[in-house]
Amino acid sequence: MGAVYLQSGVCLLPKTDDHVRRLKMIENDIVEMTGESVILETIALDRGQEEKVVARFRADRDEEYRELLDKCSDFDTEIERETAARHFTYAELEENDVDLKKLQSWFEKIRKLDFYGAPLAAEAAERLRECEARLEGYAQQVFDAHDENR
């Protein structure tokens, strides 16, 4: 859900209809298991406190974007390796296409939880576009290699 965890089971989320609905369902599950749950709406005491919370949300998302950026680098390395080996097969193209779709899906999941615009969001989006372009280039090489063999 993208919450910031404070301590002892206390977490913060921006109030959205989706969060309220999901939290109510979670609360119901907890109560059915004879547990306790309290959902509160809070307001920061001042702008400084609010900025601390927003900074935590951004830091959490940046950590996820950093992981994604690392995986984008791995994706690029794989395409470079296949290109250097002149391994232009449809099977390899399909495998790389699946990997790119996983990266795209992961990015969308992070973006959906990026409530306050983490600093690395733009870099991650650009990096993903570069991966898409790299795969397009590799795909063209696969097509060309297969056309030459006909």
Predicted regions and their residues:
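Glycine-rich, aromatic-bearing surface loops/beta-hairpins
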Residues: K101-R150
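Solvent-exposed, non-transmembrane amphipathic alpha-helical segments
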Residues: D18, I43-D46, E50, F57, ...
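Cap/lid and interdomain-hinge subdomains that line or gate substrate/regulatory clefts
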Residues: K71, F75-E78, E82-R86, Y90-L93, ...
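Alpha-helix boundary/N-cap detector
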Residues: E63, E67-D70, A91, V98, ...
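Positively charged, polar, low-complexity stretches
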Residues: M1-E80, S105, K112, C131
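Long, hydrophobic, amphipathic alpha-helical segments used as structural scaffolds
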Residues: T34, E41, D76-T83, H87, ...
